[in-house]
Regions:
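A short, N-terminal "cap"/entry segment at the start of jelly-roll beta-barrel domains
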Residues: 1-46, 55-57, 89-93, 132-134
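Double-stranded beta-helix
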Residues: 2, 25-28, 107-134
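Short acidic-glycine-tyrosine-enriched beta hairpin
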Residues: 81-103
Length: 134
């Protein structure tokens, strides 16, 4: 066993990646709190907050695969089926989850008040977000 920075690690055990503080990104629609974005492990974790009356752009990702978990409020998710072009809309409530696969155009809207949700996804690259409309 080795001691490192007050922690004891067994031989061969990988150390946890330390992150001093979450990164906060202010958006015109609310904000994102980035807990992790790790290219090596292909992993990203954020808390998103969308203010009442606001929405994200209609966009898609070629590489990013996302899962949402609603922690507060209601989230309206508008998406477009990439096979037949049919537009779909659904309302997610606290405790609901939704998985969005790569390539699916989607827009997220605070429905009837502010909304907060956790996004777990593959690694986030700004260049992978393709905006269709604001």
């Amino acid at each position: 066993m080795k001691k490192s920075g007050g922690q004891i690690w067994r031989e061969g055990q990988r150390k946890m990646k330390e992150q001093a503080k979450a990164k906060v990104v202010e958006k015109e629609w609310g904000r994102e709190i980035w807990m992790a974005n790790n290219a090596e492990e292909n992993y990203c974790s954020k808390i998103l907050q969308i203010n009442q009356g606001y929405n994200t752009s209609l966009h898609f990702h070629l590489e990013k695969h996302e899962t949402f978990y609603i922690t507060k409020g209601q989230l309206q998710v508008d998406s477009i089926c990439t096979i037949n072009g049919v537009k779909m809309s659904r309302i997610l409530n606290e405790g609901d989850t939704l998985e969005l696969k790569r390539g699916v155009p989607h827009q997220l809207t605070a429905y009837d008040g502010d909304v907060e949700f956790i996004e777990i996804s593959t690694f986030h690259k700004d260049s992978d977000s393709k905006r269709i409309s604001r």
